[in-house]
Amino acid sequence: MPKYYGFKVFDHILYFTTHCTVEAMHVHAGNEEMNERIAAKFFVKANGDTVLQKAGDLKPHQVSGIQQFIKENYREMYARWQEYSDTGFYTGRVSI
């Protein structure tokens, strides 16, 4: 599973799975197991704003901190995403 960075953000690894790259760009935030069933999931918009689909085990301050981190780094993160996917940013049309 590709990681966006080699370090943790608010004590969580930011990653995506190669089988989920058919969806719009998003970020899973999880522990070392990187199990997406229990990880948080943020969809990323073209301006860096995020939509929290699932909070996982994140506390509210971790959610807002990770959202801010994504906002500040989304262009770099999107470049990493594009290494694996040709899907774009979240536009509000995701089937759950």
Predicted features by range, described:
Residues 17-61:
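A short, structured beta-strand/loop element
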Residues 7-8, 18, 34, 66, ...:
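Alpha-helical protein-protein interaction elements
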Residues 14, 22-26, 33, 49-50, ...:
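Residue-level detector of solvent-exposed, low-hydrophobicity positions
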Residues 5, 14, 40-41, 67:
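Short non-domain terminal segments
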Residues 54-96:
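Acidic, low-complexity intrinsically disordered segments
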Residues 1-25:
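Short, charged/polar N-terminal "headpieces" of proteins
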